[in-house]
Amino acid sequence: MPTSVLWAVDLFGRVYTLSTAGQYWELCKDVQLEFKRVSAATQCCWGIAGDNQVYLYVCSSDVPIRHREEAYENQRWNPMGGFCEKLLPSDRWPWSDVSGLQHRPLDGVALPSPHWEWESDWYVDENFGGEPTEKGGWTYAMDFPATYTRDKKWNSCVRRRKWIRYRRYKSRDSWAKIPSKDDPKELPDPFNDLSVGGWEITEEPVGRLSVWAVSLQGKVWYREDVSHPNPEGSSWSLVETPGEVVQISCGPHDLIWATLWEGQALVREGVCRNNPKGSYWSMVEPPGSENGIMHVSAGVSVVWAITKDRKVWFRRGVNSHNPCGTSWIEMVGEMTMVNVGLNDQVWGISCEDRAVYFRQGVTPSELSGKTWKAIVVGRESDRSHSGSSSSLLSAGCFFGDEVRGSGTESAPSDTDASLEVERQGPEQPLPKEALDNSTNLKGSLSKGHETSGNTDHSTENACLTEGKEKAPETSRSDECRGPASTPAELPWTNIDLKEPKKVSNQPAAGFPETAGLSSLGLFPMGMEEPYGADDHPLWAWVSGGACAVEAGSTLKWFTIQSGLSPSVQTLSLSITPAQTAAWRKQIFQQLTERTKRELESFRHYEQAVEQSVWVKTGALQWWCDWKPHKWVDVRVALEQFTGHDGARDSILFIYYVVHEEKKYLHVFLNEVTVLVPVLNEAKHSFALYTPERTRQRWPVRLAAATEQDMNDWLALLSLSCCESRKVHGRPSPQAIWSVTCKGDIFVSEPSPDLEARERLLPCDQMFWRQMGGHLRIIEANSRGVVWGIGYDHTAWVYTGGYGGGCFQGLASSTSNIYTQSDVKSVYIYENQRWNPVTGYTSRGLPTDRFMWSDVTGLQECTKAGTKPPSLQWTWVSDWYVDFSVPGGTDQEGWQYASDFPASYHGYKTMKDFVRRRCWARKCKLVTSGPWLEVAPITLSDVSIIPESAHADGRGHNVALWAVSDKGDVLCRLGVSELNPAGSSWLHVGTDQPFASVSIGACYQVWAVARDGSAFYRGSVSPSQPAGDCWYHIPSPPKQKLTQVSVGQTSVYALDENGNLWYRAGITPSYPQGSSWEHVSNNVRKVSVGPLDQVWVIANKVQGSHGLSRGTVCRRMGVQPREPKGQGWDYGIGGGWDHISVRANATRVPRNMSRDREARGPGPVCC
């Protein structure tokens, strides 16, 4: 589960965050303001301060928030002076926007608020449609509304060029005041409530937020244009309501609820992608007529409410199609407020003790949860409080009166906090609503069965009883000074919350050592907080919009024992997971050594049994080799035997019946090259390849009845294959990694003659073994650093283990295996044809494609009939329209064309007789493997420097470049063998979003933008990891590049049509090269290694028995004089999607090459 934070505000207006992986409340970095309430999203938090103004807190990130400003310079040609700024009266402005309708001079473009800053001055954009323009960046046309070209023609009467300038948001990790317009008529009233949500509205662009606010006069306001590149938004717009609103809540999706002064609830209807503000309000009556609704909180599919009598209610039947729900259900507990966060998890603040409670047991099937559980963690400042007094406090608690005098010397007391308060200024009374329920704090964490369990240790009970008996009933300052006060009494001291009393600056007469310790700095600066070290924080507001808690996950928020102060809690001894792992490893190592000692003395004895044989049998299904191909029931037997030399080998027998005749098929497992699960939504099947089966493109396919049976057979057969080839443990640093279209990860150990120039090993004989996990892209280098990217753009780093997934037990390492999840989308298309009577309908011609189909139209795919890719995936969303398809869409998601096989566009013309719309649905997979998440930036591409085997990389870090899912180019710092995840990202500025990046062995960095243009980064070195500037490289004629891969000296690129290109003319003095040369077509992915070896994934490869899509291929004949090679060697195939050979720097040893030459020359051709 990724780390996220819970936001909360205490009664003194201080904002805290609590991490899902932490155990302490951390005070917000910017503590200059006091807040009433906050509303959090993943990337930011909005809040209302004590001045009733709205503030925004944007969390820091390695990727800056940048916005590009554009202005166009327009000129017209005249016979006297050529092109000039003197235009016709009917022309556009000399300086305008892209449409020409808005006057936009360079000096008239200002920053929207003080929270922005300019990155640089204005400069000309010399990129036009992916191609570099001439010097000056001018583009030409016959007239301004016409189509522009890079080349000047005889009829080019006008020209224009684009000026760009970037501004950067600078107010991060601080509260920035949202600016308001100066016009009093447009200035909204002071706010008293706000809510942030809407980031998961169906079909909405990623990064857009809906910010709703309520003013003191009961008006509802909506903040326009709030998004990731514009976190502040642009302006406030008034939303009409049927009454005065007191509070509003916006869920992550399209649920928006508000409460009225009269106690009813308002529900916003018609919220969608094109209308995030909705259309109208619907009224929902409160649960009872006596007590109206005073607070409401909306989630994805739930709504929680609190009535005026503090009762908690759950709204049943709420969803996007019925946002009003059906009925109210009363829940247990009394709260002042509740908040629904991500995954419909719920938090609340209790009326009795002002503690934050978490609703446990909330799942998609039980949205109301089961019980409330108090979050009992302390604050960050409490660590030093408890640490400075834990030893003496333990002595005073467990050894009686003998050390209580000395224990008091270092124990923090309320006097110290009072002294700090007096030095700060006048006393600060608590809010009135906290006075009624907060006089006694000792029962707040131990009352009720829904809070954390009470302790029952005799020593703790004795200490608690003794502290109760000796606690004097005096004022707060008197307690701290009294000689009978002990550290054990601090948690149960009565605190007068109504009027905190001042105390003199003079230290207590009986405790001279306390003042001395305090002057030495043993007490932290957190002592000026309004709470004592062991006081229970009093909360006023909580927001879980940025807290992602998955159902069934384990949190550390409830591990502190209730009824004990943080100081006493430090006494409990616990064994951390790291200590447990070290302890287990030590015992395992000792047992292994003892076993070796016991066996060494008996190795000279003859074995009683010369060889052992064991057999495993079972029932499976086999995809038969003959026509008609179908699944047939078979019996399988795996026979494993141990030879005289101790080596193990195995044979797999498949027994089947043909025309009542029993036959069998056998496979030697030492000949098997790969065992791969097959993507099938109906069968638990896997394929078995041998070199002969690889050349035929016809593997042995077997299917099990259940997923567990398939995993058992797959793990057993894989283990047997590894034992036959003596392949065990983690892959070597030079291993070759690959990923299938299913997301399965495979690795192969390269032999020395794999990249030999003569008598090289055919790549169809390479052995591939599966690693646990699920990825879409993988990248490795020869120093053992391996990174991967999932389908949801999450970055993962290899931990050094092996196995995971279905390979548990003997086929998996005992450590470095972690849970991994991935999310991908399934797409189907809705097709319609136009007719003159009814317009576009789902009735097509008999020759048309299915009205609900896949992207090709050849396979019928309906919403009800479409299933996840395999049985391991589960749906996590409903069907929604995908607006991000190539070619663009209209507001409803439709694409138009003259006929179905033609090209589609996002607007309707007179010749468009068909249209289609893409629907998507997300599904999720949970597995395990040797991978750890690299948060928080999501990536679309990654590249690691391919180092040669003789390169010494001990003096510098591993160079790693990546492209985020938003198109930002990043450089990872601090990557090494010991720290493969690195430390931080360094942003590399670009003028447009990028799609692919690759770094070569000599630090040459090439990249491809989303418009298909190529770029080279200059001056990249270990001392200057980000380089200095980009050089625009012309793309191949009429082609748009999609991927680039750089080796030691070679640069290869791939275009959108599957053509592979080689960059010729690259020299050390001219690293940009001179031209592109075509190498091959039918290529899906390319990977160039440190030896300039070229490996690709081919789209289609025809075998003797079948056709495989997605095949691993190696370029033959690559050498310095022939860098493009001469042909292809076809390897494993049928479903492969990505490969990385950038770690394979293994060369043939020189003595081996000389031995081959000594054997004799090859065949001579006359």
Curated annotation (Swiss-Prot):
Biased amino acid composition, Polar residues: 407-416, 451-462
Task: Enumerate the TECPR repeat regions by residue range.
Answer: 209-240, 254-285, 301-332, 344-376, 734-761, 958-989, 1003-1034, 1049-1080, 1092-1132
All copies of domain PH, residue ranges = 616-722
Which residue ranges have biased composition labelled Basic and acidic residues? 466-481
> Which InterPro entries does this chain map to?
Beta-propeller_rpt_TECPR (IPR006624), Peroxin/Ferlin (IPR006614), PH-like_dom_sf (IPR011993), TECPR1-like_DysF (IPR010482), Tectonin_beta-propeller (IPR051513)
Provide the alphabetized UniProt keywords: Autophagy, Cytoplasmic vesicle, Lipid-binding, Lysosome, Membrane, Phosphoprotein, Repeat
Q: Please report a single Pfam family linked to this protein.
A: Pex24p
For the region Disordered, give the residue spans: 404-496
The record's GO CC annotations read: autophagosome membrane; cytoplasmic vesicle; lysosomal membrane; nucleoplasm; protein-containing complex
Q: Which SMART domains match?
A: DysFC, DysFN, TECPR
Entry GO MF terms: phosphatidylinositol-3-phosphate binding
Mark the residues carrying the PTM Phosphoserine.
S386, S388, S391, S413, S418, S943
A biological-process GO annotation: autophagosome maturation
User: What does the UniProt entry say about where the protein is found?
Assistant: Cytoplasmic vesicle, Autophagosome membrane; Lysosome membrane
Record remark on domains: The PH domain mediates the binding to phosphatidylinositol-3-phosphate (PtdIns(3)P).
**Family recorded in the similarity comment:** Belongs to the TECPR1 family.
Write down the PANTHER family for this protein, in alphabetical order. Answer: DYSFERLIN-RELATED (PTHR23250), TECTONIN BETA-PROPELLER REPEAT-CONTAINING PROTEIN 1 (PTHR23250:SF1)
Q: How does it assemble?
A: Interacts with ATG5; the interaction is direct. Interacts with WIPI2. Interacts with the ATG5-ATG12 conjugate, the interaction is however mutually exclusive with ATG16, since it does not interact with ATG12-ATG5-ATG16 complex.
What does the protein in this record do? Tethering factor involved in autophagy. Involved in autophagosome maturation by promoting the autophagosome fusion with lysosomes: acts by associating with both the ATG5-ATG12 conjugate and phosphatidylinositol-3-phosphate (PtdIns(3)P) present at the surface of autophagosomes. Also involved in selective autophagy against bacterial pathogens, by being required for phagophore/preautophagosomal structure biogenesis and maturation.
What is the name of this protein? Tectonin beta-propeller repeat-containing protein 1
Q: Which organism is it from?
A: Mus musculus
Q: Which gene encodes it?
A: Tecpr1
